[in-house]
């Protein structure tokens, strides 16, 4: 739950996610093909059943039809980083809105979306066919990539060079780099590839937790 956010918008988000998942679940991405998040989902309109949900804009919250679909693009991006698939287009928010409390993934590991300008596009440069499975579970948004051949490698995402940089105007920029590590099935590191460089204006005190402890 998010502080100061209308919980009806959160409930509406679940409806929006179910509609979008229905458009993506079962997608086959064959060798040489590229998928576009927005091409597959289409414009999220009230006529299609989408409801007002929360979106982030310029570091703040507002309600918009189809709001909440960034949660799905975040999941798909994170899933894809754990495969050999190629991310062709990905964007992230220019603002870091949430402190790290309860964070389970590195900062900057999501993919924001805004129809029709900010898309998430993924290309299959392998010789195998991939299938996307996504759904709204009982408590979580769930997803996986399935592949037509037995996997010969596994993947992990690690964070490097994480910094909170003070700026001349009094605020902070949060920076990090994400790398995809490729291992063979015996656990030997085969490669480490840069996949994202993130910079975002922080919308909270970078020393929030320390301040609370001192208080």
Would you name each region that the model predicts?
Residues 1-215:
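Well-ordered beta-sheet/strand-loop patches within structured domains
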